[in-house]
């Protein structure tokens, strides 16, 4: 799946041995009973190199900015597919690396009791690397 599929809580219809399964794409791995045998479904999203998703469905975005490029701006916009996470420049510290957290603004959390539940969202962690060049 794509990041857009994950953000939009898209489902995939899978056919296996004449059986049909509706797969929530924001899950990492699901196991279904397929005519007495376990059917393992792994959802491996297609992600850019600077983005990862952890076991709790939190998104981690790693970005690099030159201090000179952002100094005169009020915000920097960190893109994650179609989502945009604005960071106020005047809240940043002059350190090489820092993390800004966008609580409950990420993907749907995995609910093992109800795999289609999309009511709780994960967090987004933006790790900024500031440089002088």
Predicted feature descriptions by range:
Residues 5-133:
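Intrinsically disordered, low-complexity linker/assembly segments
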């Amino acid at each position: 799946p794509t990041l857009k599929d994950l953000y939009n809580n898209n489902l995939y219809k899978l056919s296996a041995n004449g059986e049909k399964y509706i797969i929530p794409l924001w899950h990492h791995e699901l196991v279904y009973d397929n005519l007495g045998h376990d059917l393992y479904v792994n959802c491996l999203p297609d992600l850019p190199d600077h983005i990862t998703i952890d076991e709790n469905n939190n998104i981690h975005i790693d970005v690099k900015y030159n201090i000179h490029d952002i100094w005169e701006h009020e915000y920097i916009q960190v893109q994650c597919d179609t989502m945009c996470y604005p960071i106020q420049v005047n809240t940043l510290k002059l350190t090489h690396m820092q993390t800004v957290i966008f609580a409950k603004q990420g993907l749907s959390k995995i609910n093992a009791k109800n795999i289609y539940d999309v009511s709780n969202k994960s967090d987004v962690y933006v790790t900024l690397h500031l440089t002088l060049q």
